[in-house]
A protein has these predicted regions:
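Residue-level detector of family-conserved "landmark" positions at structurally sensitive sites
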Residues: 31, 99, 127, 147-148
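Helix N-cap / beta->alpha transition motif
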Residues: 36, 52, 126, 154-158
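Conserved C-terminal helix/tail region of periplasmic/extracytoplasmic solute-binding proteins
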Residues: 130-166
């Protein structure tokens, strides 16, 4: 809709949209103006791993295994990005390896490689920032309650820092 001038602005998932724009032959840096939430004063966390309370209670080792597998996959991709892209293109033949490499680099540069993740490791959160994020979301959506940060995130499931550092 944005590309067809049907709307003036759009909220998008930047990793997806940035590369989709490249994929249709446009330049996302020249043809569009981006307003990242963080750069615009909205300092909230976004994506993460969520599991049901039932799984967390009944199979905590499975949750720990899932988080460890994600961390290992992340470490493997950081160590050998091309191998990660090759797995994507082998799994999904419609994918474009060159675009997927750009997508990976964009995600790393814009979402993962930060001072916070460098200091705390990939996957960790800063408790004060998480509490602010929760408050912001509660206020934006006029939600009835405010969960405590420790009810939203449990660092005990994270693998050792050595596995999450870059």
């Amino acid at each position: 809709m944005l590309i067809q001038d049907q709307v003036s602005a759009s909220l998008v998932f930047n990793v997806t949209s940035y590369l989709n724009i490249i994929g249709i032959g446009m330049d996302p840096d020249k043809d569009f103006t981006w307003y990242p939430y963080g750069a615009s004063g909205l300092d909230i966390y976004s994506n993460g791993v969520m599991v049901s309370p039932k799984l967390l209670k009944e199979k905590p080792e499975a949750v720990k295994g899932l988080v460890n597998a994600i961390a290992k996959a992340m470490a493997d991709v950081l160590a050998n990005p091309q191998e990660g892209i090759d797995i994507i293109t082998a799994t999904e033949p419609l994918s474009n390896g060159e675009l997927e490499m750009k997508r990976l680099q964009f995600a790393l540069d814009n979402l993962i490689f930060s001072d916070e993740s460098k200091a705390n490791g990939i996957g960790a959160v800063d408790a004060e920032r998480l509490a602010r994020s929760i408050t912001t979301i509660k206020e934006l959506y006029d939600l009835p309650g405010t969960p405590a940060a420790e009810d939203v995130f449990d660092a005990s499931f994270l693998p050792p820092m050595a596995m999450r550092s870059f």
